[in-house]
Curated annotation (Swiss-Prot):
Protein purpose: Plays a crucial role in the metabolism of thyroid hormones (TH) and has specific roles in TH activation and inactivation by deiodination. Catalyzes the deiodination of L-thyroxine (T4) to 3,3',5'-triiodothyronine (rT3), 3,5,3'-triiodothyronine (T3) to 3,3'-diiodothyronine (3,3'-T2), 3,5-diiodothyronine (3,5-T2) to 3-monoiodothyronine (3-T1), rT3 to 3',5'-diiodothyronine (3',5'-T2) and 3,3'-T2 to 3'-monoiodothyronine (3'-T1) via inner-ring deiodination (IRD). Catalyzes the deiodination of 3-T1 to L-thyronine (T0) via outer-ring deiodination (ORD).
Topological domain ranges for the Extracellular compartment: 68-304
Active-site feature positions: U170
GO cellular component, one term: endosome membrane
Disordered: annotated segments: 1-22
InterPro entries linked to this entry: Iodothyronine_deiodinase, Iodothyronine_deiodinase_AS, Iodothyronine_deiodinase_I/III, Thioredoxin-like_sf
Enzyme Commission number, as recorded: 1.21.99.3
Family per similarity comment: Belongs to the iodothyronine deiodinase family.
Topology feature Cytoplasmic, residues: 1-44
Name the UniProt record assigns to this protein: Thyroxine 5-deiodinase
GO molecular-function terms, A-Z: thyroxine 5'-deiodinase activity; thyroxine 5-deiodinase activity
């Protein structure tokens, strides 16, 4: 009897209370997951750092006015002179992509600018959206009533959905808004358009530029973002306008900072524009829409 009791005692001590290994296993899995994320972040930084250094060096060079005037005011030899477009009254209209102008009193290589550049490059590297792949159905917010929706809620059947990401303090975005409005007017019969207001490109308490048409600080709340979006809405084209969430979920999913253009059709990304400011080309969007219109109606569209 004593031997049996001792045997039962040893077995009981070895088993331990049920579920004792559960918290330890969960903690181990969590630690492993965080370690993998840290390794991924470190690897991405190593990949991005040379690109970031190149951009930083270019910004430093552009702070020399003689270099800035030479590079920003010359026309690339591969880009021919744009066609002159006339409106119904025979008046010449501005080009789709007016040249990027930077005033002489603006410094480009600052701590705030480098932070913004790094933020944009990191979002672009980790974005989920890629041309030919599925369109991320990220969350957006309506400016009236703060109702939460999804980007693909604005897609209707097989009609293309054009996404235009940007903010009021982004000079290229605002300078090309009239060209975007012309595309909305021309193609809205067959195509849907959605403007997504994201975090400010040049907030008054961040990377400041005198070329920005508005003085708007960083958004501290959704109410701040709504107020900024209403400024854009007053002069925005006749298409839907929504806000990115304060977690910047749509900007992150689409790598949209500073500004960017996309076309979605049947849940697939058919066109992915370059990241602004250099890659933000309304003329590329026009070309895509002209080709789509030609395929849809079988006639070559006429520019107006």
């Amino acid at each position: 009897m004593p031997r049996q009791a001792a045997s039962r005692l040893v077995v009981g001590e070895g088993e331990g209370p049920p579920g004792a290994s559960g918290p330890a296993a969960t903690m181990l899995r969590s630690l492993l997951l965080h370690s993998l994320r840290l390794c991924a972040q470190t690897a991405s930084c190593l990949v991005l750092f040379p690109r970031f250094l190149g951009t930083a060096f270019m910004l430093w060079l552009l702070d020399f006015l003689c270099i800035r005037k030479h590079f920003l005011r010359r026309r690339h030899p591969d880009h021919p002179e744009p066609e002159v477009e006339l409106n119904s009254e025979g008046e010449e209209m501005p080009p789709d992509d007016p040249p990027i102008c930077v005033s002489d009193d603006n410094r480009l290589c600052t701590l705030a600018s480098l932070k913004a550049v790094w933020h944009g490059q990191k979002l672009d590297f980790f974005k989920q959206a890629h041309e030919g792949g599925p369109a991320p159905n990220s969350e957006v917010v309506r400016p009236d009533g703060f109702q939460s929706q999804r980007i693909l809620d604005y897609a209707q059947g097989t009609r293309p959905l054009v996404l235009n990401f940007g903010s009021c303090t982004u000079p290229p975005f605002m300078a090309r808004m009239s060209a975007f409005q012309r595309l909305v007017t021309k193609y809205q019969r067959d195509v849907d358009f959605l403007i997504i207001y994201i975090e400010e490109a040049h907030p008054s308490d961040g990377w400041v530029t005198t070329d920005s048409p508005y003085v708007i600080p960083q958004h501290r709340s959704l109410e701040d973002r709504v107020s900024a979006a209403r400024v854009l809405q007053q002069g925005a084209p006749g298409c839907a306008l929504v806000l990115d969430t304060m977690a910047n979920s749509s900007s992150s999913a689409y790598g949209a900072y500073f500004e960017r253009l996309y076309v979605i059709q049947s849940g697939t990304i058919m066109y992915q524009g370059g990241r602004g400011p250099d890659g933000y080309q309304v003329s590329e969007l026009r070309t895509w829409l002209e080709r789509y219109d030609e395929q849809l109606h079988g006639t070559r569209p006429h520019r107006f």
